[in-house]
Amino acid sequence: MQRLCAHVLILVLALAAFCEASWKPHSHLQDAPVAPGANRGQEPLRMNRLGPASNPRRQLGLQDPPHMVADLSKKQGPWVEEEEAAYGWMDFGRRSAEEGDQHP
């Protein structure tokens, strides 16, 4: 039982270290110097609307969900062509059956 607890503890610590390491590249956004008055009035408005941001959300910079969804909708991969090819094959079978019904 102690061995299992030790393995679970090591796993949790490793995952915590991995998560912390994955957030570190974004932390430079928070530490970057900003010109005085550049974002005056924007930050309090966002904070009031969204509530207090968690540490990871602050490090990422407060992004609105519509912007993230728009970015995802622009991405297309090679699977689109594969799906079109698969649907074309299925349509071929259906069209053949429909043509057989029309001609006596």
From Swiss-Prot:
Region Disordered: start-end pairs: 27-77
Residues of the signal peptide: 1-21
Sites bearing Pyrrolidone carboxylic acid, chain numbering: Q59, Q76
GO MF entry, a single one: hormone activity
InterPro entries in the cross-refs: GAST (IPR039236), Gastrin/CCK (IPR001651), Gastrin/cholecystokinin_CS (IPR013152)
Gene Ontology biological process: G protein-coupled receptor signaling pathway; response to food
Keywords tagged on the record: Amidation, Cleavage on pair of basic residues, Hormone, Phosphoprotein, Pyrrolidone carboxylic acid, Secreted, Signal, Sulfation
Keyword Metal-binding: no
PROSITE patterns, alphabetized: GASTRIN
Removed propeptide positions: 22-58, 96-104
Subcellular location: Secreted
PTM annotation (Sulfotyrosine): residues: Y87
Any single Pfam family the record assigns to this protein: Gastrin
Phosphoserine, modified sites: S96
Phenylalanine amide carried by residues: F92
Top-level taxon of the source organism: Eukaryota
One term under GO cellular component: extracellular space
Similarity-based family: Belongs to the gastrin/cholecystokinin family.
Cited function: Gastrin stimulates the stomach mucosa to produce and secrete hydrochloric acid and the pancreas to secrete its digestive enzymes. It also stimulates smooth muscle contraction and increases blood circulation and water secretion in the stomach and intestine.
PANTHER family documented for this protein: GASTRIN (PTHR19309:SF0)
Protein name as catalogued: Gastrin
